Swiss-Prot record:
Keywords: Cell inner membrane, Cell membrane, Chaperone, Disulfide bond, Electron transport, Membrane, Oxidoreductase, Redox-active center, Transmembrane, Transmembrane helix, Transport. Belongs to the DsbB family. It comes from Aeromonas salmonicida (strain A449). Residues 1-14, 66-72, 165-173 are cytoplasmic. The lineage of its organism: Bacteria, Pseudomonadati, Pseudomonadota, Gammaproteobacteria, Aeromonadales. Required for disulfide bond formation in some periplasmic proteins. Acts by oxidizing the DsbA protein. Coiled coil: none annotated. It holds the Pfam family DsbB. GO terms for molecular function: electron transfer activity; protein-disulfide reductase activity. It is found in: Cell inner membrane. This is Disulfide bond formation protein B. GO terms for cellular component: plasma membrane. The gene is dsbB.
């Protein structure tokens, strides 16, 4: 089983599936924004950035998964992005489930001055929605609740694949 897990991270197909799943989520977010007319809030924008981190990890892993340093860089980016995405989605769910004048998100994105993504790519990163508003549901779960499940799944798969790569084996030097 460990050998199988090590082999997964050493193949482009697995990294491609990771990138494709994140690309699907990004395209879905743009569909919700531009076709259905839902306005992204600050937390939505940050969650998009976390998904872009997972997408970037998948693309980095596809470059040369047999090279340990690229594989581990992709794994670390994947793990960090999934973890931060889960934190953000949980906080976003808290804003929605416990609305209060004292529990609100900022109306402005707080990107570093050296990377003002909301100014560089406003069509993707400009927030103009309300974090506590539930404007869409599927199977009675809001979008941030679905993102909790998605980021938790990304994190779980990351942990399993990473454990497989930490254990010494005969594969994938």
């Amino acid at each position: 089983m460990i050998e199988f897990l090590r082999r997964i991270a050493a193949h482009r197909l697995a990294w491609g599936l990771l990138a494709a799943s994140a690309l699907f989520l990004e395209l879905s977010a743009l569909f919700f924004q531009y076709v259905l007319g839902l306005h992204p809030c600050v937390m939505c924008v940050y969650e998009r950035l976390a998904i872009l981190g997972v997408l970037s990890a998948g693309l980095l892993g596809m470059v040369a998964p047999e090279k340990w340093y690229l594989r581990w860089s992709a794994l670390l980016l994947w793990g960090y992005s999934a973890f931060r995405g889960l934190q953000l989605a949980l906080k976003h769910v808290d804003y929605q489930m416990n609305p209060s004048p004292f529990n609100v998100c900022s109306p402005f994105a707080d990107f570093p001055s050296w990377a003002p993504l909301d100014q560089w790519l406003p069509w993707l990163f400009f927030p103009d929605g309300d974090c506590s508003e539930i404007s869409w549901q599927f199977l009675s779960f809001s979008m941030p609740q679905w993102l909790v499940a998605i980021f938790a799944a990304y994190l779980l798969v990351f942990v399993v694949v990473t454990i497989g790569n930490l254990v010494k084996g005969r594969c994938c030097s």
